Amino acid sequence: MSKRTNNKKRKHSEYEKELEPENQDENQDEEFLEDKNKDKNQNKNKDKNKNKDMNKNKNKDMNKNNNKNNNKKKKENGNENVLNSQFYKNIKENRQITDIFKTLVECINEKIESLEDEENNNQDNENFIYICEKLREQFIKIYEKEIIEYKLFREIQALTIVKERELYDILKECDKRLALFRDHQSNCLKAKCDVESQMLSIERKEELNEYLYYDNDSIPENSNSTTTTTKKSKKKTKASFLTLVGKANFNTNFPSNFDRLFSISCERD
């Protein structure tokens, strides 16, 4: 019996040993799956946080835009400066006071009515009624004054807005006229330059004509000395003509044709 049991035990242990790597693989798979799930959860949380941040930023941008639009509207209506002005603050305070005055006047009216209804009107009651009426008059005056001031303030505000618009239109018109004047000035300068260049070219042409077609009276009557004088005059004229050509800044093709032109002009003489 003991042998059998030992054999059984040995077989069982061997079987367990064989199963061990399989169990290890299973455990590893489970661990891997757990890690995967953890990563997934982490990614989900990250995405959630990202979305939260995105929504926060969107809300911030929305609030910024709303504030900008509100400020623009305030500026357009001309209320921004008004709200910050001392005058408007005074009106606000006065309005609060007038509200108190209103309630006081109502209370006084009620009191006067109740006193008037009483049968036993003594001197104290009459005095009190008189004081209340005087107070009521004062309150009404203050209230009316506040209304007039507020109306004046609104009129001034409207006037300033109109004047600002008029000033803006005038400035725009000034800019337009200035641009037109600058264009006109540049056109005048161009025209002036063109005229000056034309005048210069005419002067140069006249000078060239003078050198090309010089007078025959400069040649002496003595026939023997004619050839020598003409040669000299030709040389002089040629030299002076070349200097003139240099001044006139003609193109490079002109000097090559110069001898031919010069000889023709001399033959003509």
UniProtKB/Swiss-Prot annotation:
Feature: compositional bias, Acidic residues: 21-33
Compositional bias ranges of the Basic residues kind: 1-12
Disordered: annotated segments: 1-82
Residue spans of biased composition, Basic and acidic residues class: 34-63
Protein name: Uncharacterized protein DDB_G0291143
Organism: Dictyostelium discoideum (Social amoeba)
